[in-house]
Amino acid sequence: MKLKDGLILREVAGQFVVVPMGKRVQEVTSIVYISSSGAYLWDYMKDHEFQKEDLVKKILEHYTGVTGEQAAVDIEKFLKTLADNNILDDGKIRGQVFVKMPKGTGKDGV
């Protein structure tokens, strides 16, 4: 998975805010704040495709006193927040997709 393009992270009044640009303004309709650890991950995520395990590893390398189990739970919540706010491109097609098939190629031969 990866972050969608057209999104930047800005620090405003001590808080990290995801700012949509261009066409993303219509998709990301809420103000999304992320923690400093989320901002640390964002810096990696903006330039890489990643899996949950990659982010857990980054957290464990950067922070002391965090267990792998707790990091995995926190990363899952973080990724859900990003996905719920149309920030994460996880490769899944959402919504309806209609494909017009040429005659004779349908499952019933029509």
PLM features per residue range, with description:
Residues 10-40:
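Short alpha-helical segments that sit at the start of domains
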